[in-house]
Curated annotation (Swiss-Prot):
CDD domains: ALDH_F18-19_ProA-GPR. It is found in: Cytoplasm. GO terms for cellular component: cytoplasm. Keywords: Amino-acid biosynthesis, Cytoplasm, NADP, Oxidoreductase, Proline biosynthesis. Coiled coil: none annotated. This is Gamma-glutamyl phosphate reductase. PROSITE patterns: PROA. GO terms for molecular function: glutamate-5-semialdehyde dehydrogenase activity; NADP binding. It comes from Streptococcus equi subsp. zooepidemicus (strain MGCS10565). Pathway: Amino-acid biosynthesis; L-proline biosynthesis; L-glutamate 5-semialdehyde from L-glutamate: step 2/2. It catalyses: L-glutamate 5-semialdehyde + phosphate + NADP(+) = L-glutamyl 5-phosphate + NADPH + H(+). It is an enzyme of class 1 (oxidoreductase). It comes from the Bacteria. Catalyzes the NADPH-dependent reduction of L-glutamate 5-phosphate into L-glutamate 5-semialdehyde and phosphate. The product spontaneously undergoes cyclization to form 1-pyrroline-5-carboxylate.
Length: 416
């Protein structure tokens, strides 16, 4: 098993070789990779079954197993995502701006690869393919470190990609997997400043916090989703019921699922029984509510301070009543993880104020937060959803994996 230094050295060499790949080269390979994923579905599912069996042995919940599980449909979706990335415009080489300065120098700012990307992620093996395809399309090498729960799946997928690269006469070190899933090795990766140009963690709050504390390499923070929906006093309550049910129950284990419900007190007594009755036909949800809201539910528990900031990733939702739009905005900005928030309202002024003042990467009016996704936003596969403000924010597609450099052409100018 190679050390982090050896993996980093190989990735750095690969990143220099990848710079010479043309758009045509990259798109042809991605089309081939999509075919290989479909062709090797049975092999991938067999390896994924090993991970699922381990999860069952360790008593992992069904919701968390869903994050880990691959199916034929999900593999086909992965292949479709790779094809979508191939179809996207190539940002590498794009001229961001160009001009001639007062000295007669022709200055061009051009989009270039980042170099070597490292990614630490949890559970979802499809991230291996999504991350690789985006990194490859932008001429970056990538080092992947998945969780121990998805090790067999990740090894199978990365081996498939490396074999496809070799068959296409492209360096297989464009992608490498760290098979040692220990915390010590992960921390070593976080500090590999000689080789890693950026580290992208994708997982729960504990992973993100560890990376923030331990990393010496540049980091793009992603993922944690304490997502709020605010039901305004001017809301269409039937619409609000539909949106909350979708955002909470469609797939609760993902980061764009709603975790916190804020309700204007003027509609609470009407809305809460409507929601409770409708959602119970779909899924039993545990409500963790403040005292005022708790009295309006037929069954709820009293929320704690920790509940209001929690990413449950389960059929659990915190509930809080407010007396005004501004109180809702203040509450959200206090507890948010800066991922996605939504307001349900027929009041245009309230909608605009909410979107202007809520400090999150994606802010919705009258729509489910489940749409915060690279595919939905037209970015193709996403490498993560950034919750920070530097470099990239929101779903990160191809442009988020690029930097720029200045090209300056003269004819003998010297500075006086």
């Amino acid at each position: 098993m190679m050390t982090i230094e050896q993996l980093g050295q190989r990735a750095k060499v690969a990143s220099r070789a990848l710079v010479s790949l043309t758009t045509k080269d990259k798109n042809q390979f991605l089309a081939f990779l999509a075919e290989e994923l479909v062709a090797q579905t049975d092999m991938i599912l067999a390896e994924n079954a090993k991970d699922l069996a381990k999860a069952a042995e360790h008593g992992i919940s069904e919701i968390m197993c869903d994050r880990l599980r691959l199916t034929a449909d999900r593999i086909h979706a992965m292949a479709h995502g790779v094809r979508q990335v191939a179809d996207l415009a190539d940002p590498i080489g794009e001229v961001i701006k160009g001009y001639t300065n007062l000295d007669g120098l022709k200055i061009t700012q051009k989009r270039v690869p980042l170099g070597v990307i490292a990614m630490i992620f949890e559970s979802r093996p499809n991230v291996s393919i999504d991350a690789f395809s985006l990194a490859f399309k932008t001429n970056n090498a990538i080092i992947l470190r998945g969780g121990k729960d998805a090790l067999y799946s990740n090894m199978a997928l990365v081996k498939l990609v490396r074999n496809a690269l070799e068959a296409s006469a492209i360096t297989p070190d464009a992608v490498q997997l760290i098979e040692d899933t220990s915390h010590a090795v992960a921390e070593e990766l976080m500090q590999a400043t000689d080789y890693i140009d950026v580290l992208i963690p994708r997982g729960g709050a504990r992973l993100i916090q560890t990376v923030k504390e331990k990393a010496k390499v540049p980091v793009i923070e992603t993922g944690v989703g304490n997502v709020h929906i605010y039901v305004d006093e001017a809301a269409d309550l039937e619409m609000a019921v539909k949106v909350v049910i979708n955002a909470k129950t469609q797939r609760p284990s993902v980061c764009n699922a709603a975790e916190s419900l804020i309700i204007h007190e003027k509609v609470g007594a009407t809305f809460i029984p409507m929601l409770e009755a409708a959602i119970s036909k779909v899924q039993q949800v545990e409500w963790r509510a403040d005292e005022q809201a708790k009295a309006l539910f037929s069954k709820a528990v009293l929320a704690t301070e920790e509940d209001y900031a929690a990413e449950f990733l389960d059929y659990i939702m915190s509930v809080h009543l407010v007396s005004s739009l501004d109180e809702a905005i203040s509450w959200i900005n206090q507890y948010t993880s800066h991922h996605s928030e939504a307001i349900i309202t027929a009041n245009i002024n309230a909608a605009e104020r909410f979107q202007d003042l809520v400090d999150s990467a994606a802010v919705y009016v009258n729509a489910s937060t489940r749409f915060t996704d690279g595919f939905v936003f037209g970015l193709g596969a996403e490498i993560g959803i950034s919750t920070q403000k530097m470099h990239a924010r929101g779903p990160m597609g191809l442009e988020a994996l690029t930097s720029s450099k200045y090209l300056i052409n003269g004819n003998g100018q010297i500075r006086s």
